[in-house]
Amino acid sequence: MAQIRVRGLADLNKFLQDLPVKMEANILRGALRAGLKPIKEAAVQNCPVGDPNDENRIKYGGYRGALRDSIRISGRFDKKQARVIARLIVGGKGKNGADVWYAHLIELTGAAPHSLSWRHTEMNHPGFRPKPFMRPALDSQANNGVLAAADYIKKRLATKNGLNTADIELGIE
């Protein structure tokens, strides 16, 4: 992974420390969300898309691309620990009502071949290999995410707080 060298962040940090806590938290939450956007876009591009079978379509409301559509960014301010948290989430119930409970299986573990039995019938499931899409997205877009977060802070301080950020240079070494 390439090193990221950002010049001028000491000035940004000093100015951020002088702001009220609520305003600082809002800026940092926005910066973290901006930093996660390139990673989210790469995860959406890498995400495997397939048709669900009829049973899963009925039981869980699945549709083609439900896993891809369940990728989202969440951000909040934890008042107890005074920190900003941003997460890139995949799975769970999506906006369209599909329950993508299997996201961790596709990303991490896959499924071993096994047999299924019901009503005196037996079927062999061939299993599947994991198809990671979140980790490769993070690996490929980490630098762009850091630059996007720093750029967001720079623009936000210039527009909303009147700080002259023209001398702050951002770039990858």
Where are the regions that the model predicts?
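Short, low-complexity, charged/polar segments at coil/turn and helix-coil boundaries
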Residues: A2, K14-Q17, M23-H125, K155, ...
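Small-xxx-small helix-packing motif
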Residues: G8-L9
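Exposed beta-sheet edge/beta-hairpin loop segments within beta-rich domains
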Residues: P126-A148, L157-A158
